[in-house]
Regions:
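Catalytic machinery of carbohydrate-active enzymes
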Residues: 1-322
């Protein structure tokens, strides 16, 4: 999901250079919120249903052909997008695909991020795909903070977002530390909002809501567009390398980002976010994974425990200007 959010930066730069260019984004309907105001078209993709199989990708390609697409930019580079672009290429449509820099990232990990330059940012890699198709434009400038509606009503005081979750254990803040971080933030700020998915994440958020009167669990209360609107009204967001960090980058909200097994130098740091918000442990064993999806070699995820709740609270204070 964070990959989709990052695409909005690249498309903003492309549309600023080519305002009359017709761009159609093939993605899940829920992600349309990331592209508000960019004058784009959409093709809804149902990867759990009609577009799940090879046949489904060919059907999606046929739909794209009927739309009259002149070129395909594959910024995802996974099996389904390869099938999609190949189907159109076989019908004579020019295609370009992302170069993910796998060797560059492996070298960064092998050297522990020491003495090696950071990998190219994913947003720039997205821009490069469009450049392969002949479009000439600059890398996007960071997003600007703009007024957006507040789904939580009138704001008074300082509001903080907290999102300790990720799809990977190596990028998820430990639960016990998360509870302590919420306590410190709730004691210090007027309102704290817990961003989460469902299941155990939602239960953690509801637990924190029950424990502190100024904490609000967001799951089930707002959709993706409402959550993005809320983030735009927050003073700071605490997030892992996750969707919420990238959503904050879209609306220029300050972020304190916590990094475990992976590293901001691998190209996935929130585009345009202030690097002063980065929290990570200097350990010989990290980074050890590009995506944070490999098990910890020690079994204890010590890199995450090294970033304490007190460190998070103090960094938030710095980011909000206390």
């Amino acid at each position: 999901m964070g990959d989709v959010a990052m695409l909005a930066h690249a498309l903003r730069a492309l549309k600023e250079a080519y305002p009359d260019l017709r761009v159609t984004v093939a993605t899940r309907p829920v992600f349309r919120a990331f592209f508000t105001g960019l004058d784009l078209g959409f093709m809804d993709v149902d990867i759990k249903g009609v577009h799940h199989s090879l046949r489904g990708m060919w059907r999606l390609a046929a739909d794209a052909r009927r739309l009259g697409v002149d070129a395909v930019a594959d910024v995802h580079g996974v099996l389904r997008s390869v099938m999609f672009r190949t189907a159109l290429w076989l019908r004579g449509v020019p295609v370009a695909a992302i170069e993910k820099g796998r060797e560059e990232k492996k070298e960064f990990i092998r050297k522990g991020g020491r003495g090696v330059k950071p990998a190219k940012h994913t947003v720039v890699r997205y821009c490069d795909v469009f450049r392969k198709l002949g479009f000439v434009f600059h890398d996007p400038v960071p997003a600007l903070r703009r007024c957006r509606p507040n789904p939580m009503g009138e704001k008074t005081g300082t509001w903080i977002g907290f999102s300790p979750f990720s799809a990977q254990q190596g990028k998820t803040y430990p639960t016990a530390l998360g509870r302590e971080a919420v306590r410190l933030l709730a004691e210090r700020y007027d309102r704290v909002f817990i961003h989460s998915g469902g299941g155990a994440e939602a239960e953690f958020a509801r637990e924190m809501e029950r424990a502190y009167p100024n904490v609000t669990a967001l799951f089930g209360r707002v959709g993706m567009d409402g959550e993005l609107d809320l983030i735009a009204n927050l003073d700071c967001v605490v997030a892992m390398d996750s969707l919420v960090m990238h959503m904050a980058s879209l609306v220029a909200t300050p972020v304190v980002s916590v990094w475990g097994r992976n590293h901001p130098g691998l190209g996935f740091f929130g585009y345009g976010c202030d690097p002063r918000g980065i929290l990570q442990a200097d350990m010989e064993c990290r980074p050890c994974s590009v995506f944070g999806n490999k098990p910890c070699r020690y079994g204890d995820y010590r890199c995450l425990y090294a970033v304490t709740p007190a460190m998070i609270a103090e960094r938030v204070a710095e980011m909000v200007g206390e």
